[in-house]
Amino acid sequence: MNDIWWQTIGEGDCHLVLLHGWGLNAQVWDCITPQLASHFTLHLVDLPGYGRSGGFGAMSLEAMAQRVLEQAPPQAVWLGWSLGGLVASQVAIMRPERVQALVTVASSPCFAARDDWPGIKPEVLAGFQQQLSDDFQRTVERFLALQTMGTESARQDARALKQAVLSLPMPSAEALNGGLEILRTVDLRQALVRLPMPFLRLYGRLDGLVPRKIVPLLDDLWPESESILFDKAAHAPFVSHPAAFCEPLLALKTRLG
């Protein structure tokens, strides 16, 4: 069985596993690892099929979560961005005793819009799947541009994300398609209602992929969780506002003792 790429850096008895989003890899965290590494032992992961974790095709959300768990420390804070937020959430559902706290970033338990739920139109996600087979690299680049749109530093932020993608092998079309299928079909809203661990949700007000309308809906659905909305950030708040992004993570660590 292939191992997934996993790097451990930093110091501190609190372990923090960082899971990236669709199409990307662990390089996206470069802008915050210096701030966090003096407080946490960081676990930087390329999800199966992405970056340096080649040799994986399309996987279900459960299979991806299980694969990451196999290499993870016995206990950690799990932080997932976008698609990575679904993987971290699935880990918390499957093995709650291994998750000290769950942090989701610009993520939704249900990315696709439903009758009663704001999200990405399913036909947009299906369109991305179609475009992937036509023009792989351009589709990924379009998706990256969408993630930073609207912020004051949009161009620079998109460049940082693009650099993270281009610096490593491109994910396979199968892995990318599998990730879009997860975004199109998964709905964890009810499964996350009774999580036993602290649950922190971070959002960008200008996010074009995860609408801010879901924030109060999830505040009602998960009253035990805490939400923070970064006013001038879009889908990648850790890239546009690294210092502000790290503050709630350090506060969470203090609370966990």
From Swiss-Prot:
In terms of InterPro entries, this protein maps to: AB_hydrolase_1, AB_hydrolase_fold, BioH, Carboxylesterase_BioH
Which family does the record assign? Belongs to the AB hydrolase superfamily. Carboxylesterase BioH family.
Which reactions does this protein catalyse? 6-carboxyhexanoyl-[ACP] methyl ester + H2O = 6-carboxyhexanoyl-[ACP] + methanol + H(+)
The gene name on file is: bioH
| Domain AB hydrolase-1 positions | 15-241
Q: Which keywords describe this protein according to UniProt?
A: Biotin biosynthesis, Cytoplasm, Hydrolase, Serine esterase
An example Pfam family from this entry, by short name, is: Abhydrolase_1
The UniProt annotation places substrate binding at 22, 82-83, 143-147, 235
This one is known as Pimeloyl-[acyl-carrier protein] methyl ester esterase
Q: In which pathway does it act?
A: Cofactor biosynthesis; biotin biosynthesis
User: EC number(s) in its UniProt entry?
Assistant: 3.1.1.85
Q: Which domain of life is it from?
A: Bacteria
Summarizing the function annotation, the protein's role is: The physiological role of BioH is to remove the methyl group introduced by BioC when the pimeloyl moiety is complete. It allows to synthesize pimeloyl-ACP via the fatty acid synthetic pathway through the hydrolysis of the ester bonds of pimeloyl-ACP esters.
In which compartments does the protein localize? Answer: Cytoplasm
Return one Gene Ontology term, BP aspect: biotin biosynthetic process
One cellular component term (GO) for this entry is: cytoplasm
Active site, per annotation: 82 (nucleophile), 207, 235
Q: What assembly does the database describe for this protein?
A: Monomer.
This entry's Gene Ontology molecular function terms read: pimelyl-[acyl-carrier protein] methyl ester esterase activity
